[in-house]
Amino acid sequence: MTEIYDFDKSAWDIKGSIAPIQPTTYSDGRLVPQVRVIDPGLGDRKDECFMYMSLLGVVEDSDPLGPPIGRAFGSLPLGVGRSTAKPEKLLKEATELDIVVRRTAGLNEKLVFYNNTPLTLLTPWRKVLTTGSVFNANQVCNAVNLIPLDTPQRFRVVYMSITRLSDNGYYTVPRRMLEFRSVNAVAFNLLVTLRIDKAIGPGKIIDNTEQLPEATFMVHIGNFRRKKSEVYSADYCKMKIEKMGLVFALGGIGGTSLHIRSTGKMSKTLHAQLGFKKTLCYPLMDINEDLNRLLWRSRCKIVRIQAVLQPSVPQEFRIYDDVIINDDQGLFKVL
């Protein structure tokens, strides 16, 4: 049986929205570079210079003899760096980078990025830019099928997204715990509803925001489990959730991310499942890559968050991450 509990909107009123990147163009049709700064935290970190940076741009033919042919729109997550430079200066240097893009394959289709330009202000992000990086193609490109192999490709930066990491603490969630299952446990999940306003250009206004499209995504927080062979009631789980004092925000980690902070009391078992962290981050890049690509430049805001209490998936249920389900005939063997 599934039980759903609605959070009060005050839990995300302050930081529950992200402004759009409104596209503007030069007279020749090229996009004007822009930077967007997001701060999903409460500002209690003493050092305010840490930030997560992503670059958005166009994957295009690297042909010096003619006008470049744009193939797809992409994102290059640079990760966390520490800098006191102004966002506009960071953007200027990013637009001057010579970033080569190559399409390849491993377990799935990949995109390889590497930069050939010396770095100054972007030195804190040199690990990704100078040594190269490989990403799941569907996570960082909206149309990887359009990228050719016989023509050199480059990534031309047009937008920059900066997320200030102003919260005191760490943001990671132990990945193994996200798949953890337990007998007689109640799974605590969140169903988040976003209202999306795609960047449609300057001067264009949608009068009725209720007509804007909505999308949902779901994240797993942890499990409530009793020591004895009994199951907590839904009402008891709701009480434990209310005591946690959860506050929600939207950030730009990997595109769009859900940030959660517990300001109250958390059960010892759940606290351990979360790696003894009370500041959490769930990037949509990992949770729902299709929705994440849709939100790269869009305005979005949280309109509803619900706690979903469900029986933990039985341990005898196997999780199939592969399309091939092996049988007793041995037709598909792992080499």
Curated annotation (Swiss-Prot):
Q: Which GO terms describe its cellular component?
A: host cell plasma membrane; membrane; viral envelope
Instruction: Please state the protein's primary subcellular location.
Output: virion
Where located?
A: Virion; Host cell membrane
Q: What GO molecular function annotations does the UniProt record carry, in alphabetical order?
A: lipid binding; structural constituent of virion
Pfam families found in the cross-reference section: Matrix_Paramyxo_C, Matrix_Paramyxo_N
GO BP annotations of the record are: fusion of virus membrane with host plasma membrane; virion assembly
InterPro entries, per the entry = Matrix_C, Matrix_N, Matrix_Paramyxo_C, Matrix_Paramyxo_N
Domain of life the protein comes from: Viruses
Q: Which UniProt keywords apply?
A: Host cell membrane, Host membrane, Host-virus interaction, Lipid-binding, Membrane, Viral envelope protein, Viral matrix protein, Virion
**Sequence similarity:** Belongs to the morbillivirus/respirovirus/rubulavirus M protein family.
This protein's assembly is summarised as:
Homodimer. Dimerization is critical for virion formation. Interacts with host ANP32B.
Function, as annotated, reads: The M protein has a crucial role in virus assembly and interacts with the RNP complex as well as with the viral membrane. Associates with phosphatidylserine (PS) and phosphatidylinositol 4,5-bisphosphate (PIP2) at the plasma membrane. Interaction with PIP2 triggers matrix protein lattice polymerization. Matrix proteins induce host membrane deformation and curvature necessary for virion assembly/budding.
- Its name, as the record gives it, is Matrix protein
